[in-house]
């Protein structure tokens, strides 16, 4: 039995998946754990399918057969060579352990695998766009993406994307082809989320980094401003994430035992309290589409200025006209969800050194936090007793 953990490519055309859902729309922030889902993953909170993810349950009466042949027979349009490459990269697991292509499947084995996305139907053309490269060597580059930039061409966003900017930046590197799935983006973050991303310049880097995301050995943390005064100083949010049946552009949290959606875990820690809002650090244990945004909405603390999840309403505070004016001013300072991918850590694919990066807040996020600091400094603690 093949479970529908495979996430169809939404990048170049709306497609109808097997549930009858239309996946068109601005959903750049697809699973950021490589969009590893990115079947079970980038992004981040992200971040779409850099990878296809499959889960296959072997029948109880299955005869022993090489796993590459078994999967090629079971999975339509997937070549045996492509499956062998996935095994060589460590992207095929049986019962939670990596196997090679000569492994022989056994009855009731649970097979999970990740396949590089196929070549794009639409060619990615370099565009001269300024990007903030915080680190670069012959294997990879780390970029601090600004809010408002889509990472990959998609419905309604065919120009001005991060990968097109990267293609221009690397135009003098003949071995880098933005249309080659063996190089390029390793994970993603949403259009209106700012922060750090790693780009692989070589197949070696793509495979090594992809494996780290797949095995959850990378480290990524986000800063977010959320509505409300969070009760606990730190905590863990667990709840399956799947598409909201009432709004296909939004994700919804389901009970972990419901069988709906995919397992998602977010860890948070309070950094600062502003009475009616809270600055938090979020660390992803998984990386589902809109994970932080959906989880925070689920526990009653949607991200500030997150229109999709209700964060553009005045959810906490005072009825005074001055407070309403203050909030509207905050909305203008940071006219997007207040979410920034602040840190990124991984092992370098060739030197094996630990690489850790920390980014400054972008100006809109910084001004927003300073505005709330000024607000709290001029407010008495009695104001917040009943919130």
Model-derived segments and spans:
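RNA pseudouridine synthases
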Residues: 1-387
């Amino acid at each position: 039995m093949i479970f529908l953990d495979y996430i169809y490519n939404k990048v170049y055309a709306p497609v109808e998946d097997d549930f009858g859902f239309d996946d068109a729309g601005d959903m750049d922030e697809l699973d950021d754990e490589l969009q590893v889902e990115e079947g079970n993953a980038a992004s981040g909170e992200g971040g779409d399918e850099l990878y296809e993810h499959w889960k296959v349950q072997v029948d109880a009466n299955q005869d022993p057969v090489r796993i590459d042949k078994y999967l090629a027979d079971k999975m339509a349009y997937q070549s045996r060579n492509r499956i062998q490459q996935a095994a060589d990269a460590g992207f095929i697991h049986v019962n939670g352990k990596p196997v090679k292509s000569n492994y022989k499947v056994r009855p009731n084995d649970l097979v999970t695998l990740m396949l590089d996305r196929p070549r794009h139907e639409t060619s990615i053309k370099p565009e001269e766009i300024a990007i903030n490269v915080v680190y670069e060597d012959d294997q990879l580059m780390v970029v601090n993406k600004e809010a408002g930039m889509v990472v990959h061409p998609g419905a309604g966003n065919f120009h001005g994307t991060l990968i097109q900017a990267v293609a221009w930046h690397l135009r003098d590197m003949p071995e880098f082809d933005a249309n080659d799935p063996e190089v390029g983006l390793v994970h993603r973050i949403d259009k209106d989320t700012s922060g750090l991303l790693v780009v692989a310049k070589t197949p070696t880097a793509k495979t090594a980094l992809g494996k780290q995301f797949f095995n959850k050995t990378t480290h990524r943390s986000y800063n977010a401003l959320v509505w409300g005064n969070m009760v606990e100083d730190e905590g863990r949010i667990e709840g399956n994430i799947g598409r909201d049946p009432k709004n296909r552009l939004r994700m919804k949290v389901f009970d972990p035992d419901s069988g709906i959606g995919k397992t998602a875990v977010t860890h948070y820690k309070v950094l600062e309290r502003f009475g009616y809002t809270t600055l938090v650090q979020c660390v992803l244990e998984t990386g589902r589409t809109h994970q932080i945004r959906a989880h925070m909405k689920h526990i009653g603390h949607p991200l500030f200025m997150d229109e999709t999840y209700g964060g553009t309403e005045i959810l906490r505070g005072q009825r005074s006209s001055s407070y309403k004016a203050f909030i509207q001013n905050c909305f203008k300072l940071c006219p997007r969800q207040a979410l920034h991918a602040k840190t990124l850590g991984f092992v370098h694919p060739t030197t094996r050194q630990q690489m850790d990066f920390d980014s400054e807040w972008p100006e809109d996020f910084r001004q927003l936090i300073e505005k709330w600091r000024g607000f709290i400094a001029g407010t008495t603690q009695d104001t917040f007793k009943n919130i």
